Amino acid sequence: MTHSLRVIFAGTPEFAAAALAAIHEAGFPVPLVLTQPDRPAGRGMKLQASAVKRYAFERGMAVAQPPSLRRAGKYPAEAVAALDLLHATPHDVMVVAAYGLLLPQEVLELPRHGCINIHASLLPRWRGAAPIHRAIEAGDAETGVTLMQMDAGLDTGAMLHEARVAIAPDDTTATLHDKLAAAGARLVVDALVELERTGALAATPQPADGVTYAEKIGKHEAALDWRKPAAALARQVRAFDPFPGGAGTLDGATLKLWAADAVPGRDDAAPGTIVDIGPDGVVIACGEGALRVTQLQKPGGKRLPAREFLAGAPLAVGQRFAPADAA
């Protein structure tokens, strides 16, 4: 099936690529794709294209990669060129998903139907850069995807559609990301079909209550504070998989702790102390309960199940991970 609604797409990572693929496969014309410039990545720090760029290039779509869209910003010449291209490209609506660049008011007002953002939370909860991580870290039972009509604020636009997604007890950011990406892809296609058919989408202002912000994830957040309850640390480990992981310092070496669950603890063990070692994992005392770690990684090594890790790097009951503020 083909459609007449012309969609400019702006996005960068895999989450956005899923939406672009769904829009393209549904038959909507995509005359232009915006994505961030290639970035150094991997051990060799070679320039790598974004997931959105790779998808668009493979299908012969026009791609632009401006470092900014702000005329008065750091890259005015590149911004002007990109804005001129947007003005010259006939389109009806812009779909934005994890693009990573600020859209100035000029861009927000350019499409006939405005700019629609795909946001990975149930707004107004978890506005901001890391909604998937923060939902898991906070212990939310569910999250979802919200389509909103973009305005000048940070994820403050009126809500158009939403899809709810349960957070499973073993969900990591990686697994929940994939669920939300699929939900967002379906949601935006349904919205575009409706927009084409009716000429408008019903918009509901976000409620003033329940606003929370999902701050960007920093590498320093990997450190586990063993004084916290084990349940909170288990959520932290899941929330920060694949980045930045959970981390603990043992005898001067930083170990990555990748998969973990909360188990009953011992009252006589100081937080951070290894209280049990077995084929199912390494059990570490916490401020409340204990954390059973089932996947570990030593510096320069690979992520391994506990049994394989212990075969090459034996640990002992009684060893103690350093406090987070002393690591």
Curated annotation (Swiss-Prot):
<keyword id="KW-0648">Protein biosynthesis</keyword>
<dbReference type="InterPro" id="IPR001555">
    <property type="entry name" value="GART_AS"/>
</dbReference>
<dbReference type="GO" id="GO:0005829">
    <property type="term" value="C:cytosol"/>
</dbReference>
<dbReference type="Pfam" id="PF00551">
    <property type="entry name" value="Formyl_trans_N"/>
</dbReference>
<feature type="binding site">
    <location>
        <begin position="121"/>
        <end position="124"/>
    </location>
    <ligand>
        <name>(6S)-5,6,7,8-tetrahydrofolate</name>
    </ligand>
</feature>
<comment type="similarity">
    <text>Belongs to the Fmt family.</text>
</comment>
<protein>
    <recommendedName>
        <fullName>Methionyl-tRNA formyltransferase</fullName>
        <ecNumber>2.1.2.9</ecNumber>
    </recommendedName>
</protein>
<dbReference type="InterPro" id="IPR005794">
    <property type="entry name" value="Fmt"/>
</dbReference>
<dbReference type="InterPro" id="IPR036477">
    <property type="entry name" value="Formyl_transf_N_sf"/>
</dbReference>
<dbReference type="GO" id="GO:0004479">
    <property type="term" value="F:methionyl-tRNA formyltransferase activity"/>
</dbReference>
<dbReference type="InterPro" id="IPR011034">
    <property type="entry name" value="Formyl_transferase-like_C_sf"/>
</dbReference>
<dbReference type="InterPro" id="IPR041711">
    <property type="entry name" value="Met-tRNA-FMT_N"/>
</dbReference>
<dbReference type="InterPro" id="IPR037022">
    <property type="entry name" value="Formyl_trans_C_sf"/>
</dbReference>
<keyword id="KW-0808">Transferase</keyword>
<comment type="function">
    <text>Attaches a formyl group to the free amino group of methionyl-tRNA(fMet). The formyl group appears to play a dual role in the initiator identity of N-formylmethionyl-tRNA by promoting its recognition by IF2 and preventing the misappropriation of this tRNA by the elongation apparatus.</text>
</comment>
<dbReference type="InterPro" id="IPR002376">
    <property type="entry name" value="Formyl_transf_N"/>
</dbReference>
<dbReference type="InterPro" id="IPR044135">
    <property type="entry name" value="Met-tRNA-FMT_C"/>
</dbReference>
<dbReference type="InterPro" id="IPR005793">
    <property type="entry name" value="Formyl_trans_C"/>
</dbReference>
<dbReference type="Pfam" id="PF02911">
    <property type="entry name" value="Formyl_trans_C"/>
</dbReference>
